[in-house]
Amino acid sequence: MKQMDANEIISFIQNSTKSTPVKVYIKGDLEGIEFGEQAKTFITGNTGVVFGEWSDIQEALETNKDKIEDVVVENDRRNSAIPMLDLKNIKARIEPGAIIRDQVEIGDNAVIMMGASINIGSVIGEGTMIDMNVVLGGRATVGKNCHIGAGSVLAGVIEPPSAKPVVVEDDVVIGANAVVLEGVTIGKGAVVAAGAIVVNDVEPYTVVAGTPAKKIKDIDEKTKGKTEIKQELRQL
């Protein structure tokens, strides 16, 4: 998949058909009720389930209200511009509760944990773990065999479109609740300490900590031992 630039993402959002999908449980005299051309209906006798756009189904419910005994509508978005990514054929481990929008690239054997939010245009490399409640903003790019710690934020850049996105190179470990601001590059093999706020580029194979984050040392054997990436967690 070619990574989208900011202007392509803006155009994608602008020109997309905005969607308010619903799932409707319905009971009544349902024979002959038309729920719209795009709706999918699973009706047996006087009960059923209907999937479709709220504008179509709302009209059908109002027109046929005398035939309907009971109805429950499930809805989780309104005028959404970007669908969720189809996960069925992705060769990665993606846990329940992760929110991943369309036009996101996920490498083989990546791991995305519960509560992670991955915005449009983001890239996640092979074997990288995105831990619980991580936020990857639009166009954020993470390389191979990284670990992005729980609650961390990689700032997104869609507007202004001229801004540079966050880039995390291969073999990087970012501790829990760290924040990496837009335009920052984290060099290969670097370690970002938990809670750090990174406002400037990080050199490869260095350790940074603090707010704002500053270099505290080069990577040594002790640090490597504490930040080892375990491939066993990435096997499918």
Curated annotation (Swiss-Prot):
Native organism taxonomy: Bacteria, Bacillati, Bacillota, Bacilli, Bacillales
Tagged with keyword Amino-acid biosynthesis: yes
Name of the molecule in the record: 2,3,4,5-tetrahydropyridine-2,6-dicarboxylate N-acetyltransferase
Pathway assigned in UniProt: Amino-acid biosynthesis; L-lysine biosynthesis via DAP pathway; LL-2,6-diaminopimelate from (S)-tetrahydrodipicolinate (acetylase route): step 1/3
GO MF terms held by the record: tetrahydrodipicolinate N-acetyltransferase activity
Keyword list, A-Z: Acyltransferase, Amino-acid biosynthesis, Diaminopimelate biosynthesis, Lysine biosynthesis, Repeat, Transferase
EC number: 2.3.1.89
The gene coding this protein: dapH
Enzyme class label: transferase
Family the entry assigns: Belongs to the transferase hexapeptide repeat family. DapH subfamily.
Catalytic reactions on record: (S)-2,3,4,5-tetrahydrodipicolinate + acetyl-CoA + H2O = L-2-acetamido-6-oxoheptanedioate + CoA
Recorded superkingdom: Bacteria
Function: Catalyzes the transfer of an acetyl group from acetyl-CoA to tetrahydrodipicolinate.
Annotated Pfam families: DapH_N, Hexapep, Hexapep_2
GO BP terms in the entry: diaminopimelate biosynthetic process; lysine biosynthetic process via diaminopimelate
